[in-house]
Amino acid sequence: LAFGIPLIQRLAQTKGKGLIIALTRELALQIDEELMKFGRSVALRTAVLIGGQSMRIQQQKIRKIPHVIIATPGRLIDHLEQKTVQLSDVRVLILDEADRMLDMGFAPQIKRILQAVPGERQTMLFSATMPSEVMHMAKMYMKLPIRIEIAPSGTAAEKVSQEVFIVRKDE
């Protein structure tokens, strides 16, 4: 959730909303919980749009004009098709675990969502790995993408030690 505080800060300075695309329902709920820890003090309103929950309850949340929408790709597409959510005021788009979304076949849904948000926006793409599909998406849908790498691919963490314990089968 490296994007939580910068997102809240950015939205406090500008009009518009944030949109976070999460891979799973569980991740979407976790993101919402963490954002609310930071956002309560600024009266942050969120709407979580995930499968397995009532569309009607989600529509009620949307009507309260949330600052941030956190959604799984499929459920967001459902809301777009039913015209119950409007993304024209999205100023910050965050794709969390983009590599896994593409691995799981969500590329068509992601492209549909990217077409529904304004061209003038900040886009943040978070990925544990950076396969060519993710790089291609970044080049297609981002203006002047900047790659920030925590550690070069294939490097071991310095402070991690590994140990092997040999145990008998009966233990």
Indicate residue ranges for each PLM-predicted region.
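Conserved nucleic-acid-binding Ia/Ib motif block in the N-terminal RecA-like helicase ATPase lobe
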Residues: 13-81, 88-92, 135-139, 147-150, ...
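Short, intrinsically disordered, charge-balanced linker/junction segments flanking boundaries
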Residues: 167-171
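Motif I (Walker A/P-loop) of helicase-class P-loop NTPases
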Residues: 1-9, 16, 32
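Switch II of P-loop NTPase G domains
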Residues: 1, 55-58, 107-108
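Post-DEXD/H (motif II) to motif III coupling segment of the RecA-like Helicase ATP-binding lobe
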Residues: 32, 86-95, 99-157
